[in-house]
Amino acid sequence: MMNGLVNWAAISELNRPAAKAGPMDTDPAKMWGAVAQMYNKMAQLEREYTQNQLDAMIITEKDTVLDIGCGPGRLSVPVASMAKSVTSLDVAQQMLEKCRENADAAGVSNLTTRLLNWDDVRPGENVEKHDIVIASRTTALADLIKLNALANKYVFILCWTKSPSLKEVHDALFYGVDDTLKPMPPMNRLLGYNVNFNLLYDMGVNPNVKVVTDGFHCDYESREAAYNDLRILHPVPEDREEIFRKNVDKRLTDLPGGGVSFRRETETYVMWWKPGKLEL
């Protein structure tokens, strides 16, 4: 890797332990499987804004696509309508089941699911190269070299540029309902997408980046309908019901024609590059 004025690799390593600590270290399949339903619901709320990310990607009907850490298929399913085929890879069987359900509901027939831990992926051995590789909000973002080795045409990586993230949007609805959930400090731009951008630059890559509006939205005919829908995201004990409703009320606005709207907006970056020999 080119020796730049700043050691971005060291900064990246220092920024990583907090994100990697926790139960995912011992059993990532169990951890991600347990939240498959929640992520599926959040993906539904994000559908309107997901289109902004899709519009930023260069994908043609001739391309094979690998979606790493696909979750419930938030990107995999709509990408399948743009591409020749999609391989949706995840560590949790429950996530892949949701992905398959969503693909079937959308009439998608060119999507294949693959159960595999990213740490066990060996490019060219147990996972073949694809034209396009997508890694969105996944631990795979920590290994740009491996991502580069899996793609023929483009690698696309996506993550948040500012607060609130998906976790923050979710958790805000359940503060006081689940005592383990606490507000997080706002994201620090000092350690944002600039880290991966500069890592790639120091490896001889000329990355592209586009920041798009992201968010979560749904309109409801009543507040009661909103409560009933959003409670799918997390268990609500009977004695915490009023706390939950007050949390939801903070995020609802009345619609002129009746009903209410839930909307939380944020931003996501889409970064991409043409794979090739890296300067390591």
Where are these regions (language model features)?
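Conserved class I S-adenosyl-L-methionine
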Residues: 1-58, 156-180
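Conserved beta-strand/loop positions that form the S-adenosyl-L-methionine
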Residues: 68
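Conserved SAM/SAH-binding loop
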Residues: 72
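Class I SAM-dependent methyltransferase SAM/SAH-binding core
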Residues: 75, 81-110, 114-120
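A short, conserved alpha-helix within the catalytic core of class I
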Residues: 139-151
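Short alpha-helix
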Residues: 189-204
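Conserved Class I S-adenosyl-L-methionine
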Residues: 208-280
